[in-house]
Curated annotation (Swiss-Prot):
Serine protease inhibitor. This is Venom peptide CtAPI. Disulfide bonds join 7-44, 16-40, 20-33, 24-64, 46-58. It comes from Chaerilus tricostatus. Coiled coil: none annotated.
């Protein structure tokens, strides 16, 4: 992981992060991805089984519905 990327505790660095990753908001109600290019970019993503909540914290998907 390059030094310029400081991922949080529940995140990991990937070379190809999706431009419109799943999060609590788009899991609860469909929202189309409006970012057309590039397809992906390096960055931090939530670890497996977790998504970002409205505050930007990685939480389990079930927590999105609480």
């Amino acid at each position: 992981q390059p030094n310029l990327w400081r991922c949080e505790k529940d995140e990991e660095f990937v070379n190809c992060a999706p431009r419109c990753p799943q999060n609590c908001r788009n899991i609860r109600s469909y929202q189309p991805c409006l970012v057309l290019t590039p397809v992906c970019a390096p960055g931090c993503v939530c670890r497996s089984g977790k998504v970002k909540n409205d505050r930007g914290d990685c939480v389990s998907i079930t927590d999105c519905f609480k």
